[in-house]
């Protein structure tokens, strides 16, 4: 499972490209949060990767147009619970997270609340100076 917020998609894209180049067909989920649909980076490439990989991309918009039919709001515990594997299948599942600090903190806290082992999630933190 990959969780990205905004430009935090960049390191996730590198991992997805590598998996595609290797012909990996494990089931993958990407939860990708942005403010608006227009702010979603790599849309076309993500569509291609969905075809090349066994990848489901879930877009989560915090300020979508009224006609948006996808997920709304922020990536929180309830949303993670909907898209993470069942608890009995989580022991072999890893979660990779990259995005703004508040999002990453909230996702990590939610994962702990969902009994995902701290050793099973990996965060890529960066700051703009």
Language model region names:
Residues 1-129:
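FNR/FR-type flavoprotein reductase catalytic core
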